[in-house]
Amino acid sequence: MRCLVVADLHYSLPQFDWLLSAAPQFDLVIFAGDALDIGSSVDFRAQIVVVKKYLAMLSGLTRVILCSGNHDLDERSAEGEKIARWVGDIRELGIACDGDDLTIGGTHFTVCPWWDGPLVKGRIEAQLRDAAAERAQRWIWVHHAPPANSPTSWGGKRYFGDVELVQWIARYQPSMVISGHVHQSPFIPDGSWFDRLGDTWVFNTGLQPGRPPVYIVLDIDEGSAFWLSAGAAQSIDLKAPLTRPATPITVAPSWLTSLDQIADPSLAKPASAAG
């Protein structure tokens, strides 16, 4: 199984367009939160409508998992906690989202919501506890915030990760945790797109502007992870101990060659010269 991982697209429509073009080459697309952008000039309700349309098209191309991030919260629950109510609507599209668990082959996925208070946090704890009771060969969590005190949550001056997540990882030891949230971690000194806590691999895609987005490819069967940004292409062996730095990709896999050939439609329509 080959998985395409993105996060923090923040309503960048060129990046969503690229995602639609790339998706058919993968068995699963994992969107680790922050599809929307609370800082955008586009009305938040309009963003939700547009992103839902993209997700509907995406779900027609391959299987999709999406968890909420802090930019995706559109309402408060009756208890006063911020929630992404719209994310629950995409379940109708066949997309696994906040609070869902699904198994594909020998891999079990747990999709965690962004939590803003004790009630949602308690639901995540119950979700993990229930999934642990029927643990599959591989267990992968999708959780927008990376763990605290990890290179994947390093912001340059301090860590921005989730302390509770560190405790959950120590307790249940999943195979992988897929996150985003801390945009700069993979690009700065002492930060990284990958880490390992005990036996658990942790990933953070990071964020870059423009098209394509920065992304990770997980080849579950081969036990490899690839990270592709505008300025780097790296891979790690998930069957080996944690080693830094990651290995530069010198021989491109066929899927990477195909992704590089995705055309940017904006380049086909150059702006008219002023005059």
Regions found by a protein language model. Give the residues of each.
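Core catalytic region of metal-dependent phosphoesterases/phosphodiesterases
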Residues: Y11-T103
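Short, conserved loop/helix-junction motifs that constitute active-site signature segments
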Residues: A23-P24, L55-L61, A133-R135, I169-Y172, ...
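Binuclear metal-dependent phosphoesterase catalytic core
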Residues: T103-G105, Q167-R171, I188-G275
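Cap/insert and terminal regions of metallo-dependent hydrolase folds
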Residues: L36-M57, T152-D190
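Active-site environment of divalent metal-dependent phosphoester hydrolases
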Residues: H10-D17, L36-S40, C67-A78, D101, ...
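Active-site-proximal beta-strand elements of phosphoester/diester hydrolases
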Residues: R2-H10, G106-D116, I140-H144, T200-L207, ...
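Conserved catalytic scaffold of divalent metal-dependent phosphoesterases
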Residues: D72-E164, A268-K269
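Active-site neighborhood of phospho(di)ester-bond hydrolases with catalytic His/Asp-centered motifs
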Residues: V5-A7, V29-D34, V64-N70, A96-D98, ...
